[in-house]
Structure formats: structure tokens, C-alpha cells
Amino acid sequence: MDNVNKPSFHNVLEFVRMFRRKNKLQREIADNEKKIRDNQKRVLLLDNLSEYIKPGMSIEDIQSIIMNMRSDYEDRIDDHIIKNADLSKERRELSKKLKTMGELK
């Protein structure tokens, strides 16, 4: 009887190990994709900045362009924070409803 349980237990341990590895790989892939997106955005930002900066511009003009771009990006960040909060609220409400539905069964 002990021999029957050992392979089964070993299979469970192997399954758990593989499942954890798969999850770790998914997290690493998502992290790398985020890094790729971030760097692509940086390249795009530099391209946009180089389009605005023209020969003969004063330092004040360039600083003004940078300040305006920064303000635009900060506004976008605020919009994303608000959207995330709304999505989190909806997710919590759905979780509560699902929990209630599960308790009714």
C-alpha cells in the first residue's frame, strides 16, 4: 500500500513544482513585456522630443516643451490611477456577489 501512495505523492509534488515554474515563467514574461513596453515608450518620447526641438531654440523654449510634455504625462497617469481604482472597485463588488452566490448553493 505504501508503494502505491509514493508514486502518486511524487506525481503530486511534480505537478506542484511544474505549476509553480509555469507561474514563475508567466510572471517573468509579463515583467519582460513591461520592460519592452517601457523602453519602447522611452524611444517614442525621445523621437517626439526631437521633433519639437528645432535648431536655434533657446533653452527656455526647450524647457517649456519638456514641462508641457511632463504635465501631459502626469495627467495621463492620474487618469490611469482613477481608472484602476474604478476597476478594482468593480472587481471587489463582483467578488462579493460571487461569494454570496456560492454560499446560496
From Swiss-Prot:
InterPro entries: DUF496 (IPR007458), UPF0265 (IPR053375)
Gene Ontology CC annotations of this record: cytosol
Main location class: cytoplasm
Keywords: Coiled coil, Cytoplasm
Protein role: Pole-localizer protein involved in the regulation of several cellular processes.
Family of the protein in this entry: Belongs to the pole-localizer TmaR family.
NCBIfam families: PRK05423.1, PTS_reg_TmaR
Listed HAMAP family: Pole_loc_TmaR (MF_00683)
Protein name in the entry: Pole-localizer protein TmaR
Organism from which the protein derives: Photorhabdus laumondii subsp. laumondii (strain DSM 15139 / CIP 105565 / TT01)
Lineage summary: Bacteria, Pseudomonadati, Pseudomonadota, Gammaproteobacteria, Enterobacterales
Gene behind the chain: tmaR
